[in-house]
UniProtKB/Swiss-Prot annotation:
It holds the Pfam family RimP_N. The gene is rimP. This is Ribosome maturation factor RimP. Gene3D superfamilies: Ribosome maturation factor RimP, C-terminal domain, RimP-like superfamily, N-terminal. GO terms for biological process: ribosomal small subunit assembly; translation. CDD domains: YlxS_C. It comes from Bartonella bacilliformis (strain ATCC 35685 / KC583 / Herrer 020/F12,63). It comes from the Bacteria. Required for maturation of 30S ribosomal subunits. Belongs to the RimP family.
Amino acid sequence: MQYINATEIMDDIDEPRLFEEDGVEALVVALVAPLLKPLGYRLVRVKLLGLNGLTLQIMAERADGTMTIEDCEIISKTISPLLDVQNVIERKYHLEISSPGIDRPLVRKSDFFHWQGYTAKIETRTIVNGRRKFRGALENVTQDGFILNIDAAPEEETVYVSFSNITNAHLVLTDKLIRDALKKDKNLRQQLIPEDDFNISESEINFSN
């Protein structure tokens, strides 16, 4: 097995996703994905939801995993005119631009690498060890797949899942994930904000409390 190393999982805006949408969602992907890349964003997922009548949810992020409200506004203003002109959704709908969230979908190999050690729910195309749905900790991520350490098994149980066999995958909210995700987000934001500005922000926060 060839394990993914630090060089291979460097943030890459061109890294392909493991899954593809179909139907109307696929048409939306074809329209918006080329618009996101020049702005420094990459698509995570497109989904039509029966919320508020009909909601078109577009998840996106920067290659480093960050995503702000301002980023969502930029994407919305960029893609809305094209979606209106192309009229791929004939019914009235609500457009929702969002970050992947803490319990994010895992859609690229690098997602699985970055979140090794955390709990995920996985669905497979074919039956593996008698089932298609799994929950467990991600371990030993390679270029071809990973080991899942199954939760709540009477005895220690692991299963190998190949990337080509996955139909759906996302992180599960746990105390550890929430704590570490917030810490990672704070560290990324500190890298993007000049030190003097960050110190001022911290002072203002402490003062307001």
